[in-house]
Amino acid sequence: MGTVGRVRLIRPAVALVTALSLITVTASASRPPERPVIALTDVLPAVAEASPAPGDGFRLTSGTVITASGAAAPVAGRLAEALRPGTGFPLPVVADSGARAIALVLEPGHPDEGYRLDIGPAGVTLRATRPAGLFAGVQTLRQLLPPEIESDAPQRRRWVLPAGTIVDAPRYAYRGAMLDLARHFHEPAEIRRYLDQLSRFKINHLHLHLSDDQGWRIRIDSWPKLTEVGGAPGTGVGGAGGGFLTKDDYRELVRYAADRFITIVPEIDMPGHVNAAQVAYPELTCDGVAPRPRTDMRVGYSSLCVSADVTYRFAEDVIRELAEMTPGPYLHVGGDEAMSTPHGSYLTFQKRVLPLVRKYGKIPYGWHEIAQSPSAAGAVIQFWGRERNSPSVATAVAAGSRVVLSPANRSYLDMKYDMLTPGGLAWAGYIEVRTAYDWDPARLLSDVPESAILGVEAPLWSETLRDSGDIDFLAFPRLVAIAELGWSPRAAHDWSSFRARLGAYGPRWIRDGVGFHRSPQINWS
C-alpha cells in the first residue's frame, strides 16, 4: 500500500497518439470529399425516436446562417463556434433570415430538456421549450456531421446532415459524473476540460468531492486553516496532490458549467473522512489533539466529535458558505464509511446536520448510509453499494427521498478495466465497457420503484490520478455507457448498437486529444 501513491496511469505515448492523429488526417485528405451521410440513429447517447426521410438532407454552405433570438441565441452561438473551424464558413447567428438556415426555436410543449430536430434540404429546425433542450439537441446535431467538422483547419468537404426527424428527451432528470478533488487536487483548467467532454453526452450534473482524510479543497472563510493546512503541498494520496479552489475559482467553475447546462454539486464529507479538517483544527476531535496527516488510502478511521458544540458550528459554517456560492439545488454532506462513529452518534449527527442544509435553501444529498436516519426523509440518497436491495434506502424512499444510482461494481470509473490496467483500483471488481453498460437502473434495487429514481452518476475517485490524461483514460469510454443509461429510453438499450456507435466516436476523441481506453470490446474506427 505504501507505493500506491506513486502509481501513475500509463497512457499511450504522445508520439503514438500524434501518429494516429496524423494517419487520420492523411486518410481524410486522400478520400473523396463526399462520405456516406451519418444516420440519425448514430448518436451517443441513443435518441428516443428517429424517423429518417428519403432524399437529400441539409447541406451546409458558405451561405448558411444560424437563426435564433432571446435565450436561444447563446446556444446558437456555441453551435456556430463548434462548426466554423472545420467548415471555414462564417455561419453568422442572426435573429431572422431568408437564407438557408439552421433555426433554433424556443416554444412550449416539449418535455423538460427534450427537443425536436427536423432536417430537410431547405433547412434545419431545432425546437425545445428550454435552452437546456436546445443545447441537448445541438449535441445531437454535432454528432450527425463528420468528426472533421470540428478540426482546427477548414476541410475541403461537403457537409451534409441526414434528412428526417428526431424527437428526444431524457429518461432521468439527473445524469451525473463525480470528480474527487480531495485525494488528488485537479486544477480548474482540468475540471473545465472534463466539463467540456461531459457536456457532449448530455451529462447535466458534476459532483465535486471537495474534502476527505487526505485533503481539503475549497476555501471556507470562517475556517481558513482548512485550506491553508488541508490544501497545502504534500496533501493528497502519496503527498502528490496539494492545492485548493478559491471561492472565485469555484464560482467561475459554476458559471462555466452552467454555460454547458451542467449543475455543480459540492460535497463536504462528514462525520467520517474528516482527518484533514482535524489536522487543521484539533478542536474538531474529542480529545483536542491533532491527528497526524494522512496520505495513504485507508478509510473509516476518522470521525467528528458528535457530542461537541464546535462540531455543529463547523458544519453550519461550511454548509452556509457553500450554499451561498452554489446556485444549484443540491448540497452533498457525504455520510459514507463512518466506521469510527458509533451508530447512535451517527444518527444524532445526521439529525442535526441534514436540517442545516435545508436551513440554507438546499436539498440534502448524501451517500446511502444517511438513509439510516429519519432526518433523511426528502433527501437525495446516492446508492453506491453492490447489493440488490437496501431496506434503509427503501424506507427513506417511502418517506419521500429520491435515489441517484452509482453502483460501485458498474459505475465507479476508478476501477480497473481488467487485471492489466495500469493505475486504478479493483476492490469493486473489474469494469469493462460492457459491464458498465449492461444493467438497468430501474431494476437495480428490487425494493425501490423506478418512480423514486432521480438518475445515475459515475464517480471517479482520484487515488491513482494525477492529470487530465489519467481522467481521460479511466472515464472514457465507460462514462458514455452511464450517460446512455441516464438519457436513453429502456427500449433503446442494446449492446450491439451501443458498441458500434461508440466505436465510430473514436475519431472525435482523437481529434479532441482525449486519451481514451481502447477497449478490446469495441471495434474502433
Label every PLM stretch briefly.
Residues 112-300, 310-312, 320-323, 327-330:
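Feature activates predominantly on carbohydrate-active enzymes
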Residues 182, 211-215, 269-273, 336-338, ...:
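Active-site beta-loop-alpha junctions enriched in small/polar residues
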Residues 3, 9-11, 15, 19-21, ...:
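Acidic, contiguous N-terminal accessory segments
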Residues 277-380, 384-401:
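Active-site neighborhood of glycoside hydrolase catalytic domains
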Residues 175-179, 206-208, 264-268, 331-333, ...:
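Hydrophobic faces of well-ordered beta-strands that scaffold small-molecule active sites
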Residues 88, 374-377, 385-525:
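Flexible, acidic glycine-rich loops studded with aromatic residues
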Residues 66, 83, 130, 177, ...:
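Conserved, mostly hydrophobic/aromatic
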